[in-house]
Every structure is written in structure tokens, then in C-alpha cells.
Amino acid sequence: MTQANLSETLFKPRFKHPETSTLVRRFNHGAQPPVQSALDGKTIPHWYRMINRLMWIWRGIDPREILDVQARIVMSDAERTDDDLYDTVIGYRGGNWIYEWATQAMVWQQKACAEEDPQLSGRHWLHAATLYNIAAYPHLKGDDLAEQAQALSNRAYEEAAQRLPGTMRQMEFTVPGGAPITGFLHMPKGDGPFPTVLMCGGLDAMQTDYYSLYERYFAPRGIAMLTIDMPSVGFSSKWKLTQDSCLLHQRVLKALPNVPWVDHTRVAAFGFRFGANVAVRLAYLESPRLKAVACLGPVVHTLLSDFKCQQQVPEMYLDVLASRLGMHDASDEALRVELNRYSLKVQGLLGRRCPTPMLSGYWKNDPFSPEEDSRLITSSSADGKLLEIPFNPVYRNFDKGLQEITDWIEKRLC
């Protein structure tokens, strides 16, 4: 496979690529307070993107590698959209966020091609896939260079899956009224059909960002993981996010009886951030098909309906929301009105009794997901569990929280 040649073809120079921070044209709020969150990273002065070190390290990237790439971006004297923001270099060249992370990914891609040990080669491919995803972050619609990086990430992920333990199958699901979508079914060693977790990821992530979750938490317990991309990104890019946020995941859930490797009588959903919006909707609409729903840092009501909460959120995250909703040119007021319709409380779901067991994990003072959202989820369930995750030490508590969530899921599936 000529991955290097593919890279050259995809990133072939053109006249002018749009720079990521210009893709969503909203009225800026001006100066914002600093934000730090376990799942989303933190705002750092002079960066448009939130720097999500915890999640990048959790996915396997060395902290020194992150700093090296950041340093190359900072040191560039190329033209920027905003001279005050390091990661707004225009065009695919040195200093551009996508260029620097993709260049780093190509280093690991070359290591993977040269490595004779299949498992080590698979690790290198996975590392490259993760770096390509960081290159494409935050995955805004219309970001041509980011979409090319996503394509390279998916290719690298497929290469990794052929070499790593267990089995991965790429699956296509038909969706009435539109294009089919592609998902990845990750299966542990042993004979199926397997109890399965349907992953509902955040809006600023790709489905290939969750391999660590499968490898460290689900696979050792004999649980499979099925992923699909959220609407408007990756393999689901032809679908826009709508108030029926769980449309694609619901279609996949209904198709599981026809998937021989999945025990469709033992399925749970796990939602990160806005993915919890999807998972909780499924808990209400498809309770006979789900044994349990777990959420982490859920975005189900407050951020979607509270103007003060929205004012505390970084510009990049609001751009992500606007991009997913297809509101690239909307005013902040129009965006607020539309976001309110995505609140599961406003929709009349949360607050009603739900038969599906639901767990929700949260951090105190989380700017994206206050404790009240998690309490709303668990108090609405006939079998609810609230899990507070202490912030420091952040990595250790994140791991401990995921272990507790996996324990809870396993008890309801196995």
C-alpha cells in the first residue's frame, strides 16, 4: 500500500484552502474567561483550538510530541488569519495546524511501513491515525484539508486493525432517506456473539478516537464496541445533526439483530459529551433494545438552553456546534434559539420516567456539563446511578471513572 503517495495526492497544493477558524462566521463574544475541562482540554492564550492534552495522551500520544508540534506552529512566521492566534496559519505549509500534525502522522506511517513485527506495526499505524485526527480537529464542515486528514486517519486505522489483537470489521448500515453510513465493530478474542457497547462520541471527535476505550476497558471483559461517526463528520458527513440527534445510532441499533457477531439482546450505549444526548434519547425511544445507558460529561440540557452557560464556552466549541447544525453564517441569537430545541428536557424526554438503567458521570464545575444535567438523567431513570469524578489527579481519576462505568455496564450486559 502506497500511503505516502496517497498523502501527496490528497494534500496536493491548490490555490487557497480556507483556514479553519474562518469557516464559521458568527458574532464573537469578545474576551472569555479561561476554561479547563477533563474531556475537552483547556483554553490557552493565543490559540483558537482548545488544547486537549488529556485525551490526546489517553489516545497514546506522548506529551513531548504534543509540545514539539505546538512549538513548530508557534515558531512559524507565515501569514495568519489572526496574528494573535498561533494556529491560524493560512494554507497547507509549515506552521499550519493541519500541516504540522499530518507531517507528524506521516513519520509514524513510515515507521509502520518499515516495521516487520505486525503488532508493533499496528501500534504505529494507530499512532498515525490518532495524529491525523488531531490534524483534522475540530472537524468543521467545509474544512477541505481536515477532511483529507480524516481520510488518511481512516486508512491508517484500517491498517492498524489488521495487525492489532482481536478482530475489527468495517460495516455499512443503510439509512432511509439518505446515504449509508460506515461503522467499525471491534471484537475481543473468543467466540461471538458478544455483548456490545454502542459508542456515541462527542461532536469534536471521530469514531476512530475511541480505540483506547475498547482496548483498555471493554475488550478485557469480553465486550465488543461498535462505533459510528456523529452526523456531519467522517463517514456520516452527508447527514446533518438534527433535533432527532439519535437518528443514525437508532438505525444501527435496529440493524443489530442481523449482525451475527453481536448479541443484540445484550447491548448498551455509552455517550461522551453531546454523544450522551444521543444515548439518552435512545434510552427513551429504544428501551427494549438497550440493557443500559452510560454517560460522561453529558450535554443534554443546560449548555443547550442557558445563555450564561453558553457565554462561558470557548469560541471553538460554539463553532463546532454551529458547524454540526449547518449554521455557518447564523447570528449568535439564531444559534441559541436552535440549540434550545436540542435540550432533551425541552423536548419533553428528560424528567419523564425512563425504564432503561442510566449512569451519568460528571466533574464539579464542568463548564460544559453541570452536575444538574447528570442528576436530571439519573433521577429520570428507574435504575439511575450518579458518579462524581474528582478533577485532580486528572488522568488517574479519568481512568478510575471509566473503570467504574465499565463495571456498571458489565453487570447489566454479562
UniProtKB/Swiss-Prot annotation:
State the protein's name: Esterase FrsA
Look up the signal peptide feature and give its range: none
InterPro entries, per database record: AB_hydrolase_fold, FrsA, FrsA-like, FrsA_esterase
- Give the EC number(s) under which this enzyme is classified: 3.1.1.1
Q: What does this protein do?
A: Catalyzes the hydrolysis of esters.
Q: Which family does it belong to?
A: Belongs to the FrsA family.
What is the gene called? frsA
The reply on keyword 4Fe-4S is no
Keyword line: Hydrolase, Serine esterase
> Which source organism does the UniProt entry give?
Escherichia coli O157:H7
Q: What class of enzyme is it?
A: hydrolase
Look up the domain of life of the source: Bacteria
Q: Which Pfam families match?
A: FrsA-like
What reaction(s) does this enzyme catalyze?
A: a carboxylic ester + H2O = an alcohol + a carboxylate + H(+)
Q: Name one GO molecular function term.
A: carboxylesterase activity
